[in-house]
From Swiss-Prot:
Matches recorded under Pfam families: Ribosomal_S21
Organism: Synechocystis sp. (strain ATCC 27184 / PCC 6803 / Kazusa)
Gene from which the chain derives: rpsU
Protein name: Small ribosomal subunit protein bS21
Positions in coiled-coil regions: none
GO molecular function: structural constituent of ribosome
Entries under HAMAP family matching the protein: Ribosomal_bS21 (MF_00358)
Amino acid sequence: MTQVVVGQNEPIESALRRFKRQVAKAGIYTDFKKHQFFETPQEKHKRKEATRRRQRSRRR
């Protein structure tokens, strides 16, 4: 879980920027987008296969 402690003289904008950076680094937003809709086993298999193909082509 991402947590940001706001300092006494720290502006809210900088704390919000730090929070957004930590969320992006932890991959929380991408995980949320991935689980937002139900994915059938067939769709999951297609997505994983496409990822494998993409990674294989990058290695060459």
